[in-house]
C-alpha cells in the first residue's frame, strides 16, 4: 500500500539545447505539474562567441564579415547598423542611389527573415505544408542576393559611404518580377493559414502581452506592434530613404500569438510596396561616396603592437573614430537592433555594445508560459522569433 502524498509531485524537464523547436541552442528548464507549466527558466550562452570584444580589436571594415553571424537570417540589417555608426561619427554622406539600393536589400532581407520565421513556426504547431512553401519564395530572394552581392547568405555588401557594387544589368527587372509573384504567394499563405480553424485554435488568445507590459519589458518590433503600439523606427528615425516611400506601419491590438503572426504577414506585403517604389524611382549616380576611397592614406595608424600581418597581406582602408559616444539603431525584422559605439581617436572602437532585439524580447518568455500548457511553449516561443546567434552574440 502506497502512502498518500501531501504535495503535488512536480516534474522538471529540460527542453533543448538540442530540441528542434528551440530554433538553435536555447535551453529551457521547465517545471511541470502534469501538463501545466509552473515555471520556466531560459539558459543562454551556448552560442556566445564574444562578438563585442572582437569588435574592439578590429577596424570597421575588418569587422563587417563578423556581424553577419549575429542574426544570420537577416544579415543586411547587421551590416547596416555596423556602417551607420561610423558614417554618423564621421558625418559621411551617402549617395541617393546607394541609399535606395540599401533600402531594397534591407526589405528583401526582412521578407526572407519573416519567411523563415513563418515556416518553422507553422511546423512547431503541427502544420508542415507551409514549411516547404516558404523555401520556394526564399530561394528566389537568395537568387537576387547572389546576383547582386555574390553570396546567398553572409553578404558583406554594405560599405561605409555606400555599397560594395552596383546592381547588375537586368537585376531590377528580375526583382520587379519577384515582387509581382510574391504578392500572389502572400495571398496563398493568407488562404492556407489565416482562416485555418486548427491554426486559430492554437494561436488565438495564447501568449497575450498587454500594451503597458510590452513597454515595461522593452519589447520592440512585431512583439511591440502586436500589442497595440504603432512604433516603427523606419517612421520614427527617418533613416535611409524610407520617408520618400508610401507605406503603412502594421500593428494589431490583441497582443497574442495570432496578432504577432498578422503583423509579420502584413509587413511582408508592405516591404514589397517599398521595394517596388524604390526600384521604379531609383536614381542614377554613384553607388558609393568616392571620397571614402581615400580614408586615411596620408598617415599610418598606430596598431598598438597588433600583429596586423597575420590578418591580411595588404592594409585595409580605415579611418579614425572620433572621440564621442553614439547610439544608432535600425528596425530589424525581430525588433530594434542597436549599437552603442564609443570612439577614442583610434581606428578601433573603444566600446561596441550590441542591443539585440531577440535577447530582450526573449526575457518575457517565462512570464508568458506560466499557467499555460506544455504544448503552448512552442507556440509562444515561435511567435517571439529568436535567433540564438543574435541572442548570445
Curated annotation (Swiss-Prot):
GO terms for biological process: photosynthesis, light reaction. It catalyses: a plastoquinone + NADH + (n+1) H(+)(in) = a plastoquinol + NAD(+) + n H(+)(out); a plastoquinone + NADPH + (n+1) H(+)(in) = a plastoquinol + NADP(+) + n H(+)(out). Gene3D superfamilies: Cytochrome-c3 Hydrogenase, chain B. It is a peripheral membrane protein. GO terms for molecular function: NAD binding; oxidoreductase activity, acting on NAD(P)H, quinone or similar compound as acceptor; quinone binding. Its EC number is 7.1.1.-. The keyword Cell membrane does not apply. Keywords: Chloroplast, Membrane, NAD, NADP, Plastid, Plastoquinone, Quinone, Thylakoid, Translocase, Transport. GO terms for cellular component: chloroplast thylakoid membrane. It holds the Pfam family Complex1_49kDa. It is found in: Plastid, Chloroplast thylakoid membrane. NDH shuttles electrons from NAD(P)H:plastoquinone, via FMN and iron-sulfur (Fe-S) centers, to quinones in the photosynthetic chain and possibly in a chloroplast respiratory chain. The immediate electron acceptor for the enzyme in this species is believed to be plastoquinone. Couples the redox reaction to proton translocation, and thus conserves the redox energy in a proton gradient. Belongs to the complex I 49 kDa subunit family. NDH is composed of at least 16 different subunits, 5 of which are encoded in the nucleus. NCBIfam families: PRK06075.1, PRK07415.1. This is NAD(P)H-quinone oxidoreductase subunit H, chloroplastic. It comes from Solanum lycopersicum. The gene is ndhH.
Amino acid at each position: 500500500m502506497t502512502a498518500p502524498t501531501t504535495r503535488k509531485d512536480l516534474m522538471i524537464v529540460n527542453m533543448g539545447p538540442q530540441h528542434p523547436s528551440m530554433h538553435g541552442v536555447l535551453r529551457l528548464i521547465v517545471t511541470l505539474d502534469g501538463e501545466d507549466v509552473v515555471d520556466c527558466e531560459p539558459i543562454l550562452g551556448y552560442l556566445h562567441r564574444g562578438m563585442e570584444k572582437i569588435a574592439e580589436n578590429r577596424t570597421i571594415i575588418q569587422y563587417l564579415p563578423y556581424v553577419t553571424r549575429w542574426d544570420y537570417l537577416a544579415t543586411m540589417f547587421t551590416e547596416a547598423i555596423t556602417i551607420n555608426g561610423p558614417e554618423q561619427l564621421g558625418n559621411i554622406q551617402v549617395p541617393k542611389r546607394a541609399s535606395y539600393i540599401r533600402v531594397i536589400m534591407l526589405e528583401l532581407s526582412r521578407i526572407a527573415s519573416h519567411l523563415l520565421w513563418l515556416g518553422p513556426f507553422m511546423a512547431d504547431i503541427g502544420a508542415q505544408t507551409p514549411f516547404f512553401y516558404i523555401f520556394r519564395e526564399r530561394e528566389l530572394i537568395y537568387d537576387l542576393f547572389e546576383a547582386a552581392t555574390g553570396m546567398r547568405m553572409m553578404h558583406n555588401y554594405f560599405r561605409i559611404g555606400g555599397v560594395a557594387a552596383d546592381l547588375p544589368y537586368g537585376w531590377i527587372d528580375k526583382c520587379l518580377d519577384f515582387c509581382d509573384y510574391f504578392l500572389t504567394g502572400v495571398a496563398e499563405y493568407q488562404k492556407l493559414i489565416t482562416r485555418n480553424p486548427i491554426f486559430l485554435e492554437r494561436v488565438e488568445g495564447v501568449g497575450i502581452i498587454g500594451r503597458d507590459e510590452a513597454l515595461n519589458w522593452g519589447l520592440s518590433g512585431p512583439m511591440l506592434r502586436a500589442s497595440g503600439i504603432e512604433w516603427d523606427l523606419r517612421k520614427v528615425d527617418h533613416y535611409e530613404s524610407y520617408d520618400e516611400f508610401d507605406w503603412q506601419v502594421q500593428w494589431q491590438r490583441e497582443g497574442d500569438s495570432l496578432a504577432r503572426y498578422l503583423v509579420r504577414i502584413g509587413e511582408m506585403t508592405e516591404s514589397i510596396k517599398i521595394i517596388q517604389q524604390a526600384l521604379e524611382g531609383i536614381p542614377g549616380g554613384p553607388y558609393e561616396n568616392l571620397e571614402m576611397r581615400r580614408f586615411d592614406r596620408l598617415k599610418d595608424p598606430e596598431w598598438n603592437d597588433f600583429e596586423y600581418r597575420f590578418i591580411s597581406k595588404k592594409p585595409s582602408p580605415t579611418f579614425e573614430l572620433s572621440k564621442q559616444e553614439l547610439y544608432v539603431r535600425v528596425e530589424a525584422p525581430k525588433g530594434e537592433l542597436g549599437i552603442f559605439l564609443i570612439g577614442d581617436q583610434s581606428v578601433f572602437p573603444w566600446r561596441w555594445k550590441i542591443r539585440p532585439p531577440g535577447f530582450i524580447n526573449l526575457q518575457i518568455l517565462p512570464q508568458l508560459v506560466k499557467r499555460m500548457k506544455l504544448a503552448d511553449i512552442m507556440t509562444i516561443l515561435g511567435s517571439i522569433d529568436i535567433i540564438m546567434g543574435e541572442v548570445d552574440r
